[in-house]
């Protein structure tokens, strides 16, 4: 539609996109939340009068609240359709990460072992929520429980992201200590298993 003849006809995709974003809670974004508070994160937007695209990341440590956030996005899409006409919004939701706590609850020894290794290299562990998706979260839901370990870096995902060499060396030492401790535990468990199945001298037959 030509802008000179647009009255009552033109629907600007970009303005509809702005309206869509305005329907989401303005204070529930990364810049206004912390700790275990969830958020909506607009990561990319592009468009013309005819077509516009908004890309979001939705995060929440609570599965229930996570589902509620997805419902809120769907409700926003329905509201835009009511305002501009059905079919205005094409909504795609794709789950990528969940809170790995659900998968680690039955194998907390993985975290305890990591804490032990940190202390052995002189670092007191600090447990903080990871406010984003991680490879460990995906691996945990693929059947390989994988808690997040620190790297020593700072300012992640920013242009000033960095990691001191000293921190890398310390974390490398911690990982080596963790592997050594796990290897020793494995040897002990193997030795114990063999002892349970070995027959005492002079015994015959099964059992």
Question: Model-found features: residue ranges?
Answer:
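Metal-dependent amide/peptide-bond hydrolase catalytic core
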Residues: 8, 12-192, 202, 207
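A short glycine-threonine-serine/GTX helix/turn-capping micro-motif
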Residues: 1-8
